Design a protein with these regions (language model features):
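Structured, solvent-exposed acidic/aromatic patches
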Residues: 1-183
Length: 183
């Protein structure tokens, strides 16, 4: 990639951590879902490569998350030749060490997610402890946007916890009842 050529490994690592976070949101929210064939670039004819992407197993998405995080853990300590990312990074202002701690925290999280299917739980529990030791040591280090306040909610939080207006309309419910639809 161009970041590897120019030596902007912190920027690349940040992208890998963000990819892992977003893949985690998808896997945690939907379970089995399109992932490996989803959101791929368009072909020359303007059509997506996969109009009906296949479902990936949630566990496969978690495996991809771990690959993103492993790559980030390799890239982040290498630093950037330019310091351009700092002003564009709303979370850690380009601090590669802070992003590295986040990557290790996420490794702990997703190792725990996979623990139920692990064939070596004791080893994975030990890994979790090692990842936690390399992650945050205080609440001040958490990944948080400083742009949100009581009147400016994080959109994911707002969607998850403020959905009082999302309900079936009376006409829709009446149609379901009329047709003996169990939904």
């Amino acid at each position: 990639s161009s970041n590897e050529v120019t030596g902007n490994y912190t920027t690349k690592g940040i992208g890998e951590v963000l990819a892992a976070i977003n893949a985690g949101l998808i896997a945690d929210s939907f379970g089995d879902t399109p992932f490996s064939q989803a959101a791929l670039p368009e072909l020359a004819n303007g059509q997506p490569q996969f109009l009906t992407p296949e479902l990936d197993k949630q566990e496969a998405i978690y495996t991809a998350i771990m690959e993103y995080l492993d790559a980030a853990i390799t890239d982040l300590p290498k630093g950037d030749k330019s310091d351009e990312i700092g002003e564009y990074d709303f979370i850690y202002k380009g601090d590669g060490e802070a992003w590295l701690k986040l990557a290790y925290g996420l490794k702990a999280r997703y190792t725990m997610r996979l623990l139920a299917r692990s064939s070596s739980k004791d080893a994975d529990l030990q890994k979790i402890l090692e990842y936690v030791d390399k992650s945050y040591t205080s609440i001040e280090e958490q990944a948080a946007f400083s742009i949100y306040s009581a009147t400016n909610l994080n959109p994911l939080f707002d969607f998850q916890w403020s959905r009082d207006g999302l309900a079936a309309s009376k006409s829709y419910a009446d149609k379901l009842i009329e047709r003996n639809d169990p939904r």
